[in-house]
């Protein structure tokens, strides 16, 4: 497949998005990195797996800023993932931001309901493994 990167925004103590990101990364054979720890993607990647969850039903400002700062020349394609109680607004908003920047975004994405994280861990690993 080429180079793969997993980036995520997780701001709660529960760390649902972090856990799903780590499982996806394990399946893909890479390491998940928080955008709060490493705010810029500095090297070309063929596939960026990017995820976050809505907070108070809106995308985290840090995730929005990260998406807006991405350099289209550094990214082949983005595949999204999200964790939430009901809303997939984060995915919809990210698709819009990234596509307006000219970044290719896959139509399909990975979703894990916040109350079913444990039962979605294996599926997250398998999702990541598809991109090896």
Feature-to-residue mapping (PLM):
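FMN-binding flavodoxin-like domain, especially the glycine-rich phosphate-binding loop
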Residues: 2-37, 44-132
């Amino acid at each position: 497949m080429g180079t793969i990167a997993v980036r995520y925004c997780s701001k709660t103590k529960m760390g649902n998005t972090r856990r799903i990101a780590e499982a996806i990364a394990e399946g893909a054979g890479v390491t998940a990195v928080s955008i709060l720890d490493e705010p810029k993607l500095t090297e070309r990647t063929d596939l960026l797996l990017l995820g976050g969850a809505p907070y108070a039903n809106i995308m985290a400002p840090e995730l929005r800023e990260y998406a807006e700062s991405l350099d289209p020349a550094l990214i082949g394609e983005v595949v999204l993932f999200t964790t939430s109680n009901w809303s997939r607004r984060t995915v919809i908003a990210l698709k819009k931001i990234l596509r307006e920047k000219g970044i290719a975004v896959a139509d399909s994405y990975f979703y894990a309901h916040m109350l079913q994280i444990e039962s979605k861990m294996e599926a997250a690993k398998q999702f990541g493994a598809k991109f090896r």
